[in-house]
UniProtKB/Swiss-Prot annotation:
Residue intervals passing through the bilayer: 4-26, 69-89, 101-121, 195-215, 258-278
The protein's name in its UniProt record: Palmitoyltransferase ZDHHC4
GO terms, molecular function: protein-cysteine S-palmitoyltransferase activity
Taxonomic path: Eukaryota, Metazoa, Chordata, Craniata, Vertebrata
Keyword Hydrolase recorded: no
Membrane topology, as annotated: Multi-pass membrane protein
GO (cellular component) term, any one: Golgi apparatus
Gene source species: Danio rerio (Zebrafish)
Cited InterPro entries: Palmitoyltrfase_DHHC (IPR001594), PFA4/ZDH16/20/ERF2-like (IPR039859)
Keywords tagged on the record: Acyltransferase, Cell membrane, Endoplasmic reticulum, Golgi apparatus, Lipoprotein, Membrane, Palmitate, Transferase, Transmembrane, Transmembrane helix
Length: 345
């Protein structure tokens, strides 16, 4: 199996994973999610009904019911990446003169990430109960647009505080609900958003750090073996200089596991970097991803066919309602607002 075939399989697997996440993790409103939905509607008539039924039940189980599948997958991917890094890359880097301190950084990041991962999985996100409901009703004001006073959760039968939402996966209402993360098998809410943000940063740093070390190892290999000045004989028997594609293919055939790992890490890094930037934006404007998606579904009240008033497509009339200034917005993530306790005399 040649390089291009393996690379095509790799790209197909990655795109399939992205499609599944967009389709079944509540991101149908995003452009990518809408594209996946349109593709699904076109392809579904060609798939047998029994196979569609099996796929639907499987995806529903994975993405809409609490389970440990993604926890185990998360740990498996880490074991594979760190196993390959320790088994091959670490030794090559030492032989090529990399410092022991720089090679220890990925393991330090792994320890930090493991602590944050545990906190994300185990800490209560801010579950609303009958006993704490009255206090949580006073934390945030209702904007009467996205969150209206007096609305009751049809499942929990509790009055919904502003910025709260019922998670259909965990079957509970959560204060300042952001989203349900399948990778930590927990909701992200007022009390654990800080851990989730740091967890995202740590995973992004891990992927980036190992990718940089691996790239440096491969570059050193290219320089030391003289591949930049090498030549090869093509199918017509003509001598050709080794270009970038030839060098990449040679590295892939020489270090297949390392190159696959590097491709996976680069993909994870850029995916998480974009996700981190999105959540940092939400932190700065004091908004949750739930509010961001809900606000996109609300049009400006002045926009109707005969008004002559047209807002930009990115117009969001509710973005600033809970905005308290950048520093206070950041502080609200790391020191969540809590109900005021009345002192008893």
């Amino acid at each position: 199996m040649d390089f291009l075939t393996l690379f095509g399989i790799y790209v197909a697997v990655v795109l399939t994973c992205i499609a599944l996440v967009c389709k079944y993790s509540g991101h149908q409103q995003t452009p990518l999610g809408q594209l996946v939905g349109a593709f699904t509607r076109i392809v579904s008539p060609c798939i047998p009904q029994w196979l569609q039924s099996i796929c639907y039940r499987t995806m529903h189980r994975l993405f809409h019911q609490r389970n440990n599948f993604f926890l185990y997958l998360h740990l498996l991917l880490e074991v594979v990446v760190y196993g390959e890094f320790t088994y091959e890359v670490f030794g090559f880097c030492l032989d090529m003169g990399s410092s022991s301190l720089s090679l220890c950084v990925p393991y330090i990041l792994l320890a930090l990430k493991s602590c944050l991962f545990y906190l994300c999985c185990s800490r209560d996100p801010g579950t609303l109960t009958k006993s704490n409901l009255s206090a949580h009703l006073k934390i945030y004001q209702y904007d009467e647009k996205l969150f209206q006073q007096g609305m009751k959760c049809s499942t929990c039968q509790l009055i919904k505080p502003a910025r709260s939402k019922h998670c259909r996966v965990c079957n509970r209402c959560v204060q300042r609900f952001d989203h349900h993360c399948v990778w930590v098998n927990n909701c992200i809410g007022a009390q654990n958003t800080r851990y989730f943000m740091l967890y995202l940063l740590s995973v992004c740093a891990m992927a980036g750090n190992i990718a940089v070390l691996t790239t440096d190892m491969l570059l050193q290999t290219v320089l030391r073996t003289g591949l930049l000045h090498a030549h090869y004989i093509d199918e017509q028997g003509i001598q050709q200089p080794a270009g970038p594609l030839f060098i990449i293919q040679h590295l892939f055939l020489t270090f297949p596991r390392i190159v696959f790992m590097l491709g996976f890490l680069v993909f994870v890094f850029f995916l998480l970097a974009g996700y981190c930037l999105f959540h940092f934006y939400l932190v700065l404007v004091n908004q949750t991803s739930n509010e961001w998606f809900k606000a996109k579904g609300h049009n400006c009240q002045h926009c109707h066919p005969y008004s002559g008033h047209n807002c930009r497509t990115s117009y969001n009339p509710f973005r600033g309602f809970y905005h308290r200034g950048i520093l206070k917005n950041i502080g609200e993530i790391f020191w969540p607002l809590r109900p005021v306790q009345k002192k008893e005399n």
